[in-house]
Amino acid sequence: MPNRSTCSLVALAAFATLTGQAAAQQQLNIYNWSDYIDPTIIEDFTKETGIRVVYDTYDSNEILETRMLAGGSGYDIVVPSAEYLARQIQAGVYQKLDPSKLTNLGNMWPMIQERVAAFDPDNAYSVNYMWGTTGIGYNTAKVAEALPNAPLDSWALVFDPQYAEKLASCGIDMLDSPGEIIPAALNYLGVNPDAASAEDIQKATDLLLKVRPFIRKFHSSEYINALANGDICVAVGFSGDIFQAR
């Protein structure tokens, strides 16, 4: 599975405290990605603390950001991807963390903290929750049937129209996440995936428009079951999701 694995390309999520009222009210309101926590952990937490957890989920950073920037979300903890942190911090939707109350900070992986610090200087508003890669998962049998000698070790599999067109017959799904897809497209074009100029973003846009007719759906969770059930043969997604589909 070709993947993005450098600092700017790692899909990170970070906890961020929003209010200080939850403990007093004996209720903690959490907004997280779907399938990102074992439900038994929530049950165990409530048994140990007596604090009730209200747990809601979303499928894209854009949904989370829209809700956060609108204000008054009511959530105490949310889990944005790292590249969205800076804009949200600047908008004032988070409170600073009190490191003295976070007794497990010493267990954080320094390398990942440094990467997140590019978006959250000094890790003042967030702590690492999860990291992984974004890449391509595929059904080997279906891909071999639709495209013999497919370039399975290359992003050309989904970004080259001559390949994408043939794979459209068995189905391609792609993450509904510009923060993941655009850097991948830039990298495929030989451009710095961190590039942010209008010219470079347009290059990625033009590439994506060429293969857009061959993409069945843009979504950030449905591709898991679709790939597992054989409804599609290729999925651009998060590594954990691809592993789950396998």
Where are these regions (language model features)?
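Bacterial N-terminal signal peptides that target proteins for export
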Residues: M1-L9
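Bacterial N-terminal signal peptides
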Residues: S8-T17
